Design a protein with these regions (language model features):
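Glycine-rich Rossmann-fold phosphate-binding loop(s) that bind the pyrophosphate
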Residues: 17-20, 42-43, 180-183, 213, ...
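Catalytic nucleophile loop
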Residues: 22, 183-186, 320
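Glycine-rich flavin
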Residues: 2-11, 28-35, 40-173, 206-210, ...
């Protein structure tokens, strides 16, 4: 880094947003000799994933799974009784863990030599940011990594609802909750709260929840949620929410009123770009408010980059981290590196759990002739148990190349399984490659290598 650069700017890189992507970019860039890095975060370091998303949600999934596990243990000979769930005790442990993780993020930044600012920052020029306390700082490169925020429709009484941000901080669990939305966040929290013993209702305006995912997987998950006790009502909407005597009266599109102790909206997320000042320096935002970038995460303003959910490309934490690494290669190492957004494995922590990589059956058949290998069965651990727990294993195969175009798993531990299956799919494995692998018996996942004949062709 030459002396002129050091003199011209306060920083070589200034990052706005202390989530997984922003922190990774700051840390790795700071490892460059002489590079001065600053980062601003208005909330808590760790961002959505660590503080109010993936991590606390997964811990809630664990917590909610113990009640059915204890019920099932009786069938296996254990003399156990399911007691009441202690929400305050769980919250104390949860907050301790989140504090620990945030401290790790802060320590990593400090040890890397990154200067941190616990303040909101906005962009006021191609090389300038303004902190909430009025200080203006200059930087050779600015990286926007502000993530996304919950989006709530404008309806009468919207001020009464909570979102996934607030669900972790409830003083007590409601007896009866309405969750509005049909995406993965809505379905995940429906399963969690139902597992805690909350009378859980999910309303969705579309015909079927989990739009955009594989149809067969959606059906298995929906059936599993209902059998576990979640009330799912589709093709309905809320028109008004009134707070009456400590409860919430929700009016649906038919004019019928329903009473709940709490209403949670999980109707999607939007890029966190409001008030950042990007429009003032001619950085393009799309219709959803996402920062428009090229394959190298660069905006039309050469000195400004953006990564993660704020770009609304693939909104997953591991993707934001990969985008951060590619950004450093591009901006600091002189090695322009695009991010590969194809064939990314992902999971939905519904109950039952869903893991997938590649194309859905509908997507694949629109592209080329395919074969579909699928099996739906009760797993071995339910041999003594009269409870709903169906497993789906599904491979979508190209008729022409024999490559596995998509893999879908609905089962306990599906997320763990899809990580391994994803390696094969990413490498371009064919159905015959899967067939060559000896099964591990007895397991659920052995079905991935023992399905010999296609169920259907399309």
């Amino acid at each position: 880094m030459n002396e002129r650069t050091k003199m011209d700017f306060d920083y070589d890189l200034f990052v706005i947003g202390g989530g997984s992507g922003g922190v990774r970019a700051a840390r790795v860039a700071a490892s460059k000799s002489g590079a001065r890095i600053g980062i601003a975060e208005e909330s808590r370091y760790g961002g959505t994933c660590v503080i109010r998303g993936c991590v606390p949600k997964k811990l809630m999934v664990f917590a909610s799974s113990y009640a059915p596990a204890m019920r099932q243990a009786v069938s296996y000979g254990w003399d156990v009784a399911t007691g009441a769930f202690d929400w305050p005790a769980f919250q104390i442990n949860l907050e301790k863990e989140l504090d620990r993780l945030e401290a790790v993020y802060r320590k990593l930044l400090k040890n890397s030599g990154v200067e941190t600012f616990d303040l909101r920052a906005t962009v006021t020029g191609p090389h300038e940011v303004c902190l909430a306390d009025g200080r203006k700082l200059t930087s050779k490169i600015i990286l926007i990594a502000t993530g996304g925020v919950p989006s709530i429709p404008l309806i009468e009484g919207a001020e009464h609802v909570i979102t996934s941000n607030e669900i972790f901080h409830l003083k007590k669990l409601p007896k009866r909750i309405l969750i509005v939305g049909g995406g993965y966040i809505a379905c995940e929290f429906a399963g969690i709260l139902n597992g805690f013993g909350v009378d859980t209702h999910l309303w969705y305006r579309g015909p079927k929840v989990l739009r955009g995912f594989d149809e067969e997987a959606r059906d298995v998950i929906t059936q599993g949620m209902k059998e576990r006790g979640v009330t799912i009502i589709t093709e309905t909407e809320t028109t008004k929410i009134d707070k009456i005597e400590g409860c919430f009266v929700v009016t649906d599109i038919s004019g019928v009123e329903h009473t709940f102790d709490l209403v949670m909206y999980a109707t999607g997320r939007r890029p966190n770009t409001q008030g950042l000042g990007l429009e003032e320096i001619n950085i393009n935002l799309d219709g959803a408010g996402a920062v428009e970038v090229n394959n190298y995460s660069q905006t039309p303003i050469a000195s400004v980059y953006a990564i993660g959910d704020v770009t609304d490309r693939v909104n997953l934490t591991p993707v934001a981290i990969r985008e951060a690494m590619a950004f450093v290669e591009t901006a600091f190492n002189g090695n322009p590196t695009p991010v590969d957004h194809s064939l990314i494995p992902s999971a939905v922590f519904t109950q039952p759990e869903y893991g997938m990589i590649g194309l859905s059956e509908d997507e694949a058949q629109k592209r080329e002739p395919i074969e579909v290998y699928t099996t739906n069965f009760r797993p071995m651990n339910t041999a003594f148990i009269d409870e709903p727990n169906k497993v789906l294993m599904k491979l979508i195969v190209s008729q022409a190349t024999r490559r596995v175009l998509g893999c879908h798993i609905v089962a306990d531990g599906a997320a763990e399984m899809i990580q391994m299956a994803g390696i094969a799919v990413k490498m371009g494995a064919t159905k015959e490659d899967f067939d060559k692998v000896c099964a591990v018996h007895p397991t659920m996942s052995e079905e991935l290598v023992t399905m010999k004949s296609p169920i259907r062709k399309a």
